[in-house]
Amino acid sequence: MGLHESQDSTIYELIEFILDDLIQFINVTELGKEIFPIATFFDKNDIIRTLMEEKIDFYSRSVDNKVIVNFDEDIFRYLINLEEFDINAEDKNGNTLLHAAIDQGKSEVVKFLTSYKNLEVNTKDLGGNSPLHLAIKSNNPEIVEMLLSYENINVNEKDKYGDTTLHKAIRSYNHKIIEMLLLREEIDVNEKDNQGETPLHGAVKSNRPEIVKMLLSHKNMDTKQKEIFSFLEISREDEAKTPINDGVSILGASEAESYGESLHNKDASSYSL
């Protein structure tokens, strides 16, 4: 056994000794708040259960939410139901329980948390990501669906780069997630990021014609964008090489939009599409 393992074992034995033999002689509240972080560090759920059984006040906000969401279910539920427990509190890393559960892929924890009416579902972490942003980045349609069912969810929330949930969904290439977002009445399909690009730009840049068509068919798509990009898609798919086709092949999405707009303002009948 190495020195580090020996120290770990000694600390663990000391905690057990305190709980078994000295608990009646000390301030149990202060004890609990000291032991809880140590027990979580050593992943000793049995010690935490002893604190629970002895009805010792042990909860401490010093423990990261990513640790809390990985507790066994009985411990997690015990903590959540404590009067002093704030379900929306951020840890030192800026993560709420919801952020942490999504990051860890804990769909059952997300389901449990979204059953609370006071859950703040749009809180951003230090990176500017809402829980819905994280679920989309994680490519997890199950959790995305849970979040979308929550009453106050904001599907147009932006991160620090100006990306909406739809911008992120386009990058995920997950059709199911994109479809779920496009079905939302309040979704803004024309919102621009900090670079001035819409989700449609992203789909064109990524060469995802099937996603481009999904966006173009949306009832709220900006008419100007719809006309320009529909015009470009026709030229891109046409086997005959036309001036428009060549332009779309050579230029990037941003330049292609400008190129398409200039052509669109001319008499398109002069080109064989």
Curated annotation (Swiss-Prot):
Keyword Repeat recorded: yes
The keyword Repeat belongs to this UniProt entry's keyword annotation: yes
Keyword field: ANK repeat, Repeat
PROSITE patterns the record matches: ANK_REP_REGION, ANK_REPEAT
Domain of life of the source: Bacteria
Database matches in Gene3D superfamilies: Ankyrin repeat-containing domain
Segments annotated as ANK repeats: 31-60, 93-123, 127-157, 161-191, 195-225
Protein name in UniProt: Putative ankyrin repeat protein RBE_0317
Species this chain originates from: Rickettsia bellii (strain RML369-C)
Lineage: Bacteria, Pseudomonadati, Pseudomonadota, Alphaproteobacteria, Rickettsiales
